[in-house]
Amino acid sequence: IPLSQHQVLYHKKQLSSTENGVNDFKFSPDEKKVIVIHSVKYGKRAVDSYPDLDKTTGRVINDAMYRHWDEWVEEIPQPFIYDFDGKTLSTHSVNILGDEPFECPMKPFGGIEQLAWSNDSKQIAYTCRKKTGLAYTASTDSDIYLYDLESGTTTNLCKPADYIAPEFDITRSLKDQAVNAFIKEGKDYNVGYDTNPQFSPDGKYIAWQSMERDGYESDRNRLCIYELATGNKFYVTELFQSNIDNYCWAKDSNTLFFVGTWHATTHVFATNLKGQIKRITDGQ
């Protein structure tokens, strides 16, 4: 078909045919695999426990976090890996979370930005708050995990392997919870929201947005950098006393650009790995 200048011919073709539909997706850099977010069944409805009451709308609730704003929690999003041959998705898939009953991406606002492919397509960094019930309701302690496709193993990048989360004490305020005492002790266990990982272009680092304290949904969002070779973590926006609303790596892997608001004006800033910050945009 002859096309005039600036015209593009699109050919639409269905690539997937999955029973659960597709909530979101992200192709690997080599385009041989794809992450697909499916909704999977979570918990039991009354009719599941009492099949003879197939018309019941009642619910048996014995734990917290049974509802998100305008919807009952009957399904949760989870990431599945499919092979892709350039034409269609494979019929077989692997759930990154295995049998774990957790959300990924996290509700209510999380999307595909909470998962990232490594540059060599061999690993996936993902965001997850691995809690249920009351602990899920009261805590904002999500972490960044690294999943290796070849071995099927998962590593928590935020906490040591022997970390055990303290029990939530309903008689204490959020500030006085044992989990937040780690901060006073100088232990950086990333006990607040940790979200939206991104690999550096050279593959040496993973960055993510990080809140310091557990239970504080409006805590300051910082940029945390994780060095894959050493396991060291450090923060590069400590001199910026406001939120990191969004960010991306520069091609040199030594600079990150981020969007932040200062004095009621939103601008683009840049920081290097030493935490030296400069404003890129000006005006209002």
Q: What kind of region is each of these model predictions?
A:
Residues 29-30, 119-120, 201-202, 251-252:
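Residue-level detector of Asp-centered blade-edge/turn motifs that repeat once per structural unit
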Residues 34-35, 124, 203-206, 256:
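Hydrophobic beta-strand positions that form the internal "hydrophobic ladder"
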Residues 2-4, 77-85, 141-151, 222-229, ...:
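Beta-propeller blade signature
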Residues 39-99, 127-130, 134-145, 173-178, ...:
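Predominantly five- to eight-bladed beta-propeller fold
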Residues 41-44, 131-134, 212-216, 262-265:
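Short glycine/acidic-enriched loop and turn motifs that connect beta-strands
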Residues 11, 93-108, 155-189, 234, ...:
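Surface-exposed loop and turn segments in beta-propeller and other repeat-based domains
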